[in-house]
Amino acid sequence: MNETLITLERVSKVYQVGEENFTALNDVSLKVEKGAFMSFVGPSGSGKTTLLNLIGGLDRPTTGKVLFKGASLENMSREQLAAYRRENIGFIFQTYNLLPVYSVYENILFPLLLNGLKESHVRERVENMVAKVGLMDQINKKPAQLSGGQCQRVAIARALVKDPLLILADEPTANLDSENSHQILRLMQELNHEYKAAVIFSTHDEKVTRYIRREVRLEDGRVSWDESRNGAEIET
């Protein structure tokens, strides 16, 4: 039986917008196991990104609990939450969020430096990750010199290089054409299989559903569907 990484217990999130309250999540309960490859699916405003933010410790629920390996994020200080993100989670964003003045190599190296590691100790690890995402011939280029698909490959490598237990991918294919979207999804599927990091997508892209092994559908802040399945076979 797989280890449970994330547990949500009756989680709700309410935002105040002017004088009105907006309920982004309403009584959501679910678990995420180690090595999961899954997605939160739903239209804009359904609560997908809010759910990722709560799991990532970027926001706190209004009511309910978010637990990581049994420890409540609610009880963590800001410093502890920062350490939780730094040590356990890799983030992949729709807009890549690469540092424009850094090369491919330097962008992937950066989270390891934040974790207090010396470049001389991790250079081989970074170069291996660059090779894994097929960018060795671009290793010294800056983000402005790369295509959208290449930038997202850098973001994937940056998320994985610190060997996280969980990767949160917020609309990672939204800015890519169909061919690049499938390439990125196949790559993430292969890396999930190899590195065993759980991956959670937030998406409204139906292409993602071909690859994932579990789909959690959200409507109006509630879970309306939670289905496990066999994803597309990994190409060899």
Where are these regions (language model features)?
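ABC family nucleotide-binding domain
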Residues: 4-211, 215-218
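H-loop (His-switch) and adjacent beta-strand-loop-beta switch element
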Residues: 215-228
